[in-house]
Amino acid sequence: NVVKKMLHNNIKGSIINVSSQMGHVGGPNRTTYCSSKFAIEGFTKSLAIELGPNGIRVNTVCPTFIQTPMTEPFLKDEEFKKTTIGMIPLGRLGEVKDLMGPFVFLASEASSLMTGSSILVDGGWTAR
């Protein structure tokens, strides 16, 4: 509905999808999750091509494990937490505040030439 209204009213702007680092890599026992995130990456790229001529940019923010109520049950498992942090070259889990900069950037005119892109906020996980 938002896109329809933007197109109907000739409103230019920025759509920011949220994916995951797992939309760029695979992982054991995460087939469904990774597949859904790969789908968001493809959706973002397709919409960027489709909506770009109308001045609508579409990008994705792809975080690593962020400490939230959703990830809390996984991170209570000390072995899982240790293994996860071991995959992140910066050596720490993400915090919600780590995502603020990328979202503000993508929503602003500072990213006016970006569309169909992903910003990985993963502490280096996907650099491996």
Positions of the model-derived regions?
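C-terminal substrate-recognition "lid" of short-chain dehydrogenase/reductases
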Residues: 57, 92-121, 126
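Active-site loop immediately N-terminal to the catalytic Tyr-X3-Lys motif
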Residues: 25-31, 53, 91, 109
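Hydrophobic alpha-helix immediately C-terminal to the catalytic Tyr-X-X-X-Lys motif of short-chain
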Residues: 39, 43-47, 51, 61, ...
